[in-house]
Regions:
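A structural alpha-helix within SAM-dependent methyltransferase catalytic domains
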Residues: 2-6
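Short beta-strand segments at enzyme active-site cores
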Residues: 14-16
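Surface-exposed patches in mature extracellular/periplasmic domains of secreted proteins
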Residues: 147-148, 224
Length: 228
């Protein structure tokens, strides 16, 4: 696709990176399919000489999407949660709105465009913990969630087991995504872990409570019942 973009005269390419930090070799080692993302960036770098610029966005987990489809280990309908370790590991996450704002800003603002030119860029709506999200969910729902726990090492073991040769079960892949995002290694803590430049998004961003309050009624069909 990058070669087709060059042939068509496209000047800027945003690859399908969105998500975990693929500049971290440990993350790519845990998630072997992400080697393909690394190879794509290597190819884009080889086409810079042909006038093709690129920006790769690291967003962390999709916050609103993760709440909708239980990727953050919260079942909003059943009022249950699976908390990794003590629930205090920090992870940066982005909503779809934040991702759209970042892309618009990169193309509309010359300073941001220069920051992002031929670079990996980090963005985030929030950097938070599972405990903070759980607190917001219980406040919005007015209901105490039933909590079970998993240790980081056990999540990694189960994920690797599912990814054994010949096993096509995506459950293992998603477990390893959660291991990277929610485990005690804090691979996705943009505020404290060194790595690519973080773009300061000019538009005001939502808080954890804002996102939870917006998504809870959409997912459950219930009205917000907790404290305001």
């Amino acid at each position: 696709m990058a070669d087709a973009a060059v042939a068509a005269g496209v000047q800027w390419f945003i690859p399908s990176e969105f998500g975990h930090d693929t500049t971290n070799p440990r993350v790519v080692e845990v998630l072997p399919p992400f080697y393909e993302k690394v190879k794509i960036i290597d190819h884009l770098r080889s086409r810079e000489k042909d006038g093709l610029n690129w920006t790769s966005l690291h967003t962390g987990f999709f916050f609103d999407f993760g709440l909708t489809f239980d990727l953050l280990e919260f079942d909003l309908r059943q009022k249950t949660a699976v908390i990794w370790d003590d629930g205090n590991s920090r992870s940066s996450m982005s909503t779809f709105k934040t991702i759209a704002q970042a892309i618009i800003q990169i193309f509309a603002d010359p300073t941001s465009r220069e920051e992002a030119k031929n670079q990996y860029i980090r963005i985030a709506t929030v950097t938070t913990t599972q405990n903070e999200i759980l607190q917001a969910l219980e406040r919005v729902s007015g209901t105490k969630f039933q909590v079970t726990r998993i240790e980081t090492a056990e999540g990694k073991r189960l994920g690797d087991q599912h990814l054994a040769p010949g096993d096509k079960d995506l459950a293992g892949f998603f477990l390893l995504l959660k291991y990277v995002a929610l485990g005690k290694n804090e691979f996705l803590d943009w505020e404290n872990r060194s790595g690519p430049h973080r773009l300061a998004i000019k538009a005001q961003q939502e808080s954890v409570l804002d996102v939870v309050g917006r998504m809870y009624p959409k997912v459950t069909g219930e009205v917000e019942r907790g404290e305001q």
